[in-house]
């Protein structure tokens, strides 16, 4: 960890229980290096927290089942919401902590099963209105307003069975531009833009050559950058179409 003057390397971990979770504005959060890490205790799903003094490994208040060892492995960036809570996206659940309580949105919470499809979270983003967007590889996009969760993909009728073409089912990146439009990067279905009323799909004909959009990054000036693969490329939207920058 670099504090602006020197680099500190932490080889030993402090393993705190879930009862010792705490939250402050200056916390740094890190994904575990492996499912099992350097110590058997790291086999319990959780995250590293640096509080300015020490690095600790904090376990999530969840129970893993045999064969689901990676179910609660971190799969997204961390999101610090406007109300102060921190959100962790794992493959099988969205876990939020507000300093005292946990919110766990998983298959059981949503009533999902083999027939409906399961959570497979690949991206999370909080928009300027405080809505949390959850991108999945399979069941599409979920939207959480702090009280209820809706399947946004189903609401917009953007499942493959509805569109017979490009869908909003495999979403790996989400971003919001300075105008409040929400953008979704997909696998093999280009980029979708939601302006609050309708959806628009951008593909190769719009200058987007990459089939997979893995990352949407927002600069300090509010510009969105889109990182893709197959083929690799970095793009920006000029208001009408995408321009490849790299």
Q: For each of these PLM feature ranges, what is it?
A:
Residues 1-246:
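Carboxylate-rich, polar loop motifs that coordinate divalent cations or form catalytic acidic clusters
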């Amino acid at each position: 960890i670099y504090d602006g003057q020197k680099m500190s390397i932490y080889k030993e971990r402090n393993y705190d229980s879930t009862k010792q979770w705490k939250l402050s504005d200056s916390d740094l959060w890190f994904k575990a290096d492996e499912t099992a890490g350097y110590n058997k205790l790291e086999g319990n799903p959780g995250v590293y927290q640096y509080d300015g003094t020490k690095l600790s490994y904090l376990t999530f208040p969840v129970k893993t089942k045999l064969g689901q060892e990676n179910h609660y492995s971190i799969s997204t960036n961390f999101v610090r919401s406007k109300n102060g809570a921190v959100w962790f996206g794992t493959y099988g659940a969205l876990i939020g902590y507000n300093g005292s309580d946990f919110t766990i949105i998983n298959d059981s919470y949503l009533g999902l099963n083999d027939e409906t499809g399961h959570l497979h979270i690949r991206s999370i983003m909080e928009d300027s209105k405080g809505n949390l967007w959850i991108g999945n590889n399979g069941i599409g996009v979920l939207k959480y307003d702090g009280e209820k969760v809706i399947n946004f993909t189903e609401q917009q009728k953007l499942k493959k069975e509805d569109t017979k073409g490009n869908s909003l089912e495999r979403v790996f990146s989400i971003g919001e531009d300075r105008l409040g439009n929400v953008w979704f990067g997909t696998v093999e279905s280009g980029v979708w833009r939601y302006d609050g009323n309708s959806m628009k799909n951008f593909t190769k004909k719009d200058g987007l050559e990459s089939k997979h959009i893995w990352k949407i990054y927002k600069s300090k000036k509010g510009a969105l950058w889109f990182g893709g693969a197959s083929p690799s490329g970095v793009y920006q939207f000029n208001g009408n179409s995408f321009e490849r920058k790299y």
